[in-house]
Structures are given as structure tokens and as C-alpha cells.
Design a protein with these regions (language model features):
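Conserved strand-turn element in the central/C-terminal portion of the radical SAM core barrel
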Residues: 1-6
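Asp-based, Mg2+/Mn2+-dependent phosphohydrolase catalytic module
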Residues: 8-31, 40-76, 80-147
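Short loop/turn motifs enriched for small/polar and acidic residues
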Residues: 35-37
């Protein structure tokens, strides 16, 4: 949006399309959050420094205004380090997925690990979104010991 490739209406249409695909499967995304801004390359009103651009936590804070968020039971899933960094900044666990940029980042981090990096910047790596979902379900819905 910030660079002018898509309008906000296009993003909203994509969100409706995604929920349309999920609905027959019995799933629905309750709310979508995105940052339309870019601090350097934004056009017009979209050229802005903001709290909603990852790795800041503004989008998480927007969700807190709408929903009761249990950080202990919440996850951030993304294909870039900035995604998992945003999750860490907010205080939730994170999963790097291998789709999109994720597999390249994972391979690069594995090479760095061999050269002395101490810890992963994410809590789990999954090949794809389905793998991430399975992992989260394996952990249990309530991370305080209840199913």
C-alpha cells in the first residue's frame, strides 16, 4: 500500500477472499491487521514512521483493543525475521515458516549457527503454515497446563 502497488481496498478484498477459502473448512480469521506505511518509500499519507510497522508492536496493540489477548497462548508466525522479532518484542512465541522468504532465512541462520551464533531468533521452524498450526496444536491450547 505504502509504495502504491495496491490500494487499501485491494488488501481488504484479499482478506475477504482468504476468509472465503477458510469458511468451508470451518475456520475464519476474526480480524486482519496490516501496516500501510513505509518510513522512506511511502507515497503521500503512507510515508510515515508508525507503531504498526514491524518489528514494532502496534498491530498487536490494535488486536488487544478488540480482543482479550492471552500472550502465553499466542504465537506470531511469519516468513521473515522482522515478523518473529515483532512477536518477541510483543512477548509471544514465534514460528518462522519456510514458505516465502523463510527457507532462505532458515538456511542462512543455520550457517551462522555453525559459526557461533548462540540462539535462534524464533521458537520453532515449520516448513509451512500447516506445519506451524500442527506444532501449535501439539503444544496444547492453554499453555498453563490445561487442554
Amino acid at each position: 500500500v505504502a509504495r502504491g502497488y495496491y490500494a487499501e481496498a485491494d488488501v481488504e478484498e484479499l482478506h475477504r477472499y482468504m476468509n472465503g477459502l477458510l469458511k468451508p473448512l470451518g475456520a475464519e480469521i476474526d480480524a486482519f491487521y496490516y501496516c500501510p506505511h513505509h518510513p522512506e518509500h511511502g507515497i503521500g499519507k503512507y510515508k510515515a514512521v508508525c507503531r504498526c510497522r514491524k518489528p514494532e508492536t502496534g498491530m498487536f496493540e490494535m488486536a488487544e483493543q478488540e480482543f482479550e489477548v492471552d500472550k502465553a497462548a499466542s504465537w506470531m508466525i511469519g516468513d521473515k525475521l522482522i515478523d518473529v522479532e515483532a512477536g518477541r518484542n510483543y512477548g509471544v512465541r514465534s514460528i518462522l515458516v519456510g514458505t516465502g522468504y523463510g527457507s532462505q532465512i532458515f538456511d542462512k541462520l543455520k550457517k551462522e549457527e555453525k559459526s557461533g551464533r548462540e540462539e535462534e531468533p524464533y521458537d520453532f521452524y515449520a516448513e509451512d503454515l500447516m506445519g506451524a498450526a500442527r506444532y501449535i496444536l501439539e503444544q496444547g491450547r492453554d499453555h498453563r497446563g490445561r487442554e
